[in-house]
């Protein structure tokens, strides 16, 4: 279910900027935050009005999705601090998720919606297959979420419908395995 709210990806970017630049000057953090909000919310179309800019803040991306994306970014940054990763599948899952997230973020660029849709579809299929190689159960759940999002034509958002539940499970089990390795 899609929730129309003011929680968009820009709030995740705001948190990441303030987290990674916590030792920098406050003016730099505010300027980077303003740039990220504008870039992640402006839709570059034929004409851009103030009303269109304000309505772009109510994108149909659920707050739960934003929290999961933020949790995954923090998880992947934590994993990259302690190389090497466990397996090649972990590398591929992280790589394809970041590519899928990048194509979703770059959706405001003025190229064809069809090409953006196809890129998201390709990266989500690669993400599902790499997730299936890492964990068959999570891969099947992700493939079911992808197919259900393809069947629903209204408010199509691959990232939202694909990653809510599988990403939560993936981050939970990976974190659990890391905790078990640290304890034993």
Residue ranges and their predicted role:
Residues 1-60:
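N-terminal topogenic module of multi-pass integral membrane proteins
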Residues 62-135:
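Membrane-proximal helix-loop-helix units in multi-pass membrane proteins
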Residues 29-39, 137-150:
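Central hydrophobic cores of alpha-helical transmembrane segments
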Residues 61, 116-118, 157-170:
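Loop-to-transmembrane alpha-helix initiation sites
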Residues 11-16, 120-129, 143-151:
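Hydrophobic, membrane-inserted alpha-helices
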Residues 79-81, 176-184:
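Membrane-interface capping segments at transmembrane-helix boundaries
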Residues 42-52, 77-78, 102-111, 150-155:
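Juxtamembrane "helix-exit" motif on the non-cytosolic side of transmembrane helices
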Residues 90, 119-120, 140-152, 168-180:
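Juxtamembrane/interfacial segments around transmembrane helices
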